[in-house]
Amino acid sequence: MQEANLAALLVTGPAAHNPPMYYMTGGGHLTHADLIKPCGADPILFYSPMERDEAAKTGLATKNIVDYNFKELLQQAEGDRIKAVALRYQKMLEEAGVTAGRVSVYGKEELNGIFGVLMQLQKLMPDVELVGEPGGNSVMLQAMATKDEHEIERIRKMGKVTVEVVGLTAEFLSSHQTKNGALVKADGMPLTVGDVKRKVHLWLAERDAEAPEGFIFAIGRDAGVPHSSGTDSDLIELGKTIVYDIFPCEKGGGYYYDFTRTWSLGYATDAAESIYNDVRTTYETVMGELKLNAPTSDYQERTCDLFEAQGHKTTRTDPALQEGYVHSLGHGLGLHVHEAPWFRSKEYATDKDILFPGAVMTVEPGLYYPDSRGLGCRLEDTVYVRPDGTMEILAEYPLDLVIPVKA
């Protein structure tokens, strides 16, 4: 915070599915709260009296929001509720010792309401500058980037859940009969992408996990568009690539895991095998070259080198590319599915984008040809940079392309 010249952090919103508040409080059933973290001082959590027990569980210094008489604040604001809330924030900041300087704002709120409140607060406190920070390198994300052993164990546990569910998915697909080149259910009706997704959500829920941002189960052309989640009505056809990218988190919005495999049911076409072999070669090469404190941009460049040598176009030569290597190599992972460190190209990288001890990140090279070949391929694992500099895949799972099915 001192380096960023911040007097305080102001975090608002629920604890669940709100990474800044979750990180500062440890989660819990807080449907709405505010937290002020002055530079060089302990944070203060402001809570609703209905959630006083949940607030107490955080172990933080707390303050009941009803101590600020909202009726009086509303009268002072002449009936303007937005201004009344801003007056309450003013009192909260002043009691926390924050009367001047830069205050960075975090959290999840309905933008329409909080925007008006912050505008009013800025007018009420002209010596305070309410600020945002560069998206990928905020103070909060920098703090979150290095994981301790407790955080690693939680991510590792989510990894075990993830690969268990992926294994169940493979078994589920393999257990089905085929008809006219596609999987069918026991009643003879086609199995669809939507059917598979419903099963995956159920398996996650049974393991106290969830996929709040969904996941990718995309077949054929959809597999060639990196973030296509797949079309629910699509049939599960043999010989078409399936990109299965699953990124669940702990129930209530805790730590994420991120994982991708590419499958082809029954058999793989020559085109699919060729693309898969190129991706796997690149994946294994890059994984074998990861080194402590190396710039992440080196590996983005290395991935471009490898794919270009195989004859594929990359975004290094064409930033508007839509076929070939059109995706970055990876990203950090934690309470967000995407966080620092970032695998950016050299012109966008910062000195913080390195493989530092305690980092958790994905490595996910892929090739995408939705229109010219009707397929795509990505392989992804989540890697922990251990304090001794070794790299650990937090949940191992086979890289096989072909999933056998019943005749």
List PLM regions with ranges.
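Active-site neighborhoods and metal-handling regions in enzymes and metal-associated proteins
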Residues: 1-407
